[in-house]
């Protein structure tokens, strides 16, 4: 996972890299369709689902492009075939804490007409193309909850077009590291202790603000 430092004491972790994030190419699975009209039946078959049978998918390295001057790592005959792409990634409990307090962005450069899916749910789409530029879609909180511990998959479909075609996309989280949980050493009988902001221990059932120690982690409840 790539990390960059930002202004205002925040950092950005790239969950899925793009060429722009500095890691270059990215592994994926892809499938080329025959016609744009094949995308709709593929959607009805839920090609974007987390539990999709991937035995007939091809392994590839993105980005994909028909133009050697635009993101070309894997050749995509975009004037002939629409394409479906699946990118798997793994999240830890620590990653989910960052996601909960942070801003999660989908970043993408496309040509043409992409539709994005996260763990089987449609995220966003775009019309046409954006050349060498990148669009950004900020995941609302309800969509951030789609991200789970363990395996996740971010998918995209693109249509065949008369001109060029390409796709580069990734996922990042920007957060304040001072707000993430801090690992602590705790004894088995010390599974949960709750303190108020004055440092006084209170009932674990309280709804008051304070510092919560649970399962070896310290979390600030605001």
Report each predicted region and the residues it spans.
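Accessory carbohydrate-binding/adhesion or oligomerization-edge regions at the termini
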Residues: 1-68, 88-90, 141-178
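Residue-level detector of functionally pivotal "anchor" positions at catalytic/ligand-binding pockets or at interdomain
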Residues: 3, 65, 75, 171-198
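Aromatic-lined ligand-binding clefts that engage carbohydrates, nucleic acids, or primary amines
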Residues: 57, 81, 89, 95-118, ...
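Extracellular beta-rich ligand/substrate-recognition surface
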Residues: 68-84, 126-134
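A general beta-strand register signal
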Residues: 117, 196, 213-214
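Short, glycine-anchored, charge-dense loop/turn motifs used at functional sites
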Residues: 120-121, 197-200
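C-terminal tail/sorting-segment detector
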Residues: 209-222
């Amino acid at each position: 996972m790539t990390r960059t430092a930002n202004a205002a004491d925040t950092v950005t972790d790239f969950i899925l890299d793009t060429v722009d994030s500095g890691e270059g190419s990215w592994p994926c699975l892809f499938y080329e369709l025959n016609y744009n009209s094949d995308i709709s039946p593929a959607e009805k078959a839920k090609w974007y689902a987390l539990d999709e049978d991937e035995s007939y998918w091809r392994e590839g390295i993105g980005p994909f492009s028909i133009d050697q001057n635009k993101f070309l790592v894997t050749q995509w005959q975009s004037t002939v075939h629409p394409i479906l792409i699946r990118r798997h990634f793994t999240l830890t409990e620590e990653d989910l804490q960052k996601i909960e307090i942070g801003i999660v962005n989908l970043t993408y450069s496309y040509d043409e007409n992409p539709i994005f899916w996260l763990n089987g749910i449609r995220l966003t789409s775009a019309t046409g193309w954006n050349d060498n530029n990148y669009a950004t879609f900020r995941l609302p909180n309800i969509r951030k909850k789609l991200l789970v511990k363990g395996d996740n998959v971010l998918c995209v479909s693109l249509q065949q077009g008369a001109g060029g075609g390409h796709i580069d996309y990734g996922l990042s989280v920007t957060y304040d590291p001072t707000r993430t949980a801090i690992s602590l050493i705790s004894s088995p009988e010390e599974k949960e202790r709750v303190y108020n902001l004055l440092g006084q221990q209170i009932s674990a059932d309280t709804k008051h603000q304070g510092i919560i120690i649970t399962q070896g982690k310290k979390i600030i409840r605001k």
